[in-house]
């Protein structure tokens, strides 16, 4: 067992512990592998981690992320409900995210989002999230003469979390690229749960779209 601590937000350290058990058979595939149990407050996640010099994998993670842990990640007023993680797996190498799958469930509740000196309230519906790795086109790389010798456009992948209602109605999308930039799109269906919101449009239409560094989320 080992203890860990990170500063997820200024002056708000998050601490916990991790238990691991080596799985030496992963060495046959050129990777170190271990089963892990990660705890922080009431958060408890179990899965398998594999890695080498150029890639890492987090496989078959299950458990829950508790409200007290979420409160250390973001400076928002949060619902008193854990996020349940089911069969979540992610693989990443130098080219980006290669594969991702799994789901999450959140019962929702009252959320307060501070911005511009004000706190905006929204009553989050019950949400489901599905994880995938989606391709994103990257501009071809030119050589010293300004000529691209390849006829193929380079491809990268982003980690995609699609948020829906339990009835599979779209609420929003989060895309995280290999440079830790996050793209957020939120729909009319989600935003109309905010009392101060007066926007109009089709429920599936995107009404908020932002791109920012992952490290600035929740500050």
Where are these regions (language model features)?
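N-terminal beta-strand/beta-hairpin edge segment
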Residues: 2-88
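Short, surface-exposed beta-strand/loop "edge" segments at domain boundaries and coil↔beta transitions
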Residues: 9-14, 39-48, 63-72, 110-115, ...
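Residues that define the transmembrane beta-barrel architecture of outer-membrane proteins
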Residues: 14, 79, 123-125, 155-157, ...
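Hydrophobic, aromatic-enriched interface-forming segments
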Residues: 75-113
């Amino acid at each position: 067992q080992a203890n860990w601590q990170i500063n997820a937000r200024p002056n708000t350290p998050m601490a916990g512990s991790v238990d691991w058990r080596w799985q030496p058979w992963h060495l046959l595939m050129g990777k170190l592998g271990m089963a892990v149990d990660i705890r922080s407050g009431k958060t408890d996640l179990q899965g398998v981690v594999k890695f080498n010099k150029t890639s890492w994998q987090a496989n078959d993670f299950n458990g829950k992320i508790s409200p007290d842990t979420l409160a250390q990640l973001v400076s928002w007023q949060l619902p008193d409900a854990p996020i349940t993680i089911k069969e979540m797996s992610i693989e990443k190498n130098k080219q980006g995210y290669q594969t991702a799958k799994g789901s999450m469930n959140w019962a929702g509740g009252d959320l307060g989002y501070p911005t511009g000196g004000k706190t905006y309230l929204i009553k989050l519906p019950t949400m489901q999230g599905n994880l995938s790795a989606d391709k994103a086109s990257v501009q071809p790389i030119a050589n010293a003469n300004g000529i691209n010798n390849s006829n193929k456009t380079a491809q990268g992948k982003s980690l995609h979390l699609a948020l829906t209602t339990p009835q599979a109605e779209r609420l929003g999308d989060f895309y995280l690229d290999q440079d830790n930039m996050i793209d957020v799109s939120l729909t009319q269906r989600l935003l109309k749960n905010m009392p101060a919101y007066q926007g109009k449009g089709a429920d599936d239409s995107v009404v908020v779209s932002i791109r920012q560094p992952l490290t600035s989320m929740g500050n």
